[in-house]
Amino acid sequence: MKIPVPYAWTPDFKTTYENIDSEHRTLFNGLFALSEFNTQHQLNAAIEVFTLHFHDEQGQMIRSNYVNTKEHTDIHNGFMDTMRGWQSPVPQKALKDGMEWLANHIPTEDFKYKGKL
């Protein structure tokens, strides 16, 4: 999916799970704030919201016995490894890659669990 401009969650990213959609909005906001201010504080905040969201989402998958939990968790872990490797100020290329990752992850990976959690 194309990166939304301005960079924000839109109904195109709706998973049908309000708690997950709310957290996805926070992820978009976190990356947008990081792109605007690009401080260590904003980087730490972005890492924190991604960590919390992935924990919540994966917990929901486990409780629902979602068949692709391990595969999905591995994808999350790969992105977290990338984010934790960022240093402030985060280069624009890395920010763009992170924004693209999120904008693509939701419709290509998260949509797979629609109706299954």
From Swiss-Prot:
List, in alphabetical order, the Gene Ontology terms for molecular function in this entry.
iron ion binding; oxygen carrier activity
Q: Keyword Ligase, does the record have it?
A: no
- CDD domains recorded: Hemerythrin (cd12107)
Q: Which Pfam families match?
A: Hemerythrin
Q: Does the keyword Iron apply?
A: yes
**Which residues does the annotation say bind Fe cation 1?**
H24, H53, E57, D110
Amino-acid positions noted as binding Fe cation 2 in the UniProt annotation, renumbered to this chain: E57, H72, H76, H105, D110
Q: Which UniProt keywords apply?
A: Iron, Metal-binding, Oxygen transport, Transport
Q: How does the annotation summarize its subunit structure?
A: Octamer composed of two types of chains: alpha and beta.
User: Per the similarity annotation, which family is this?
Assistant: Belongs to the hemerythrin family.
What PANTHER family has UniProt attached to this entry? BACTERIOHEMERYTHRIN
UniProt cross-references to NCBIfam families, sorted A to Z: hemeryth_dom, Hemerythrin
What's the protein name? Answer: Hemerythrin subunit beta
Organism the protein comes from: Lingula anatina (Brachiopod)
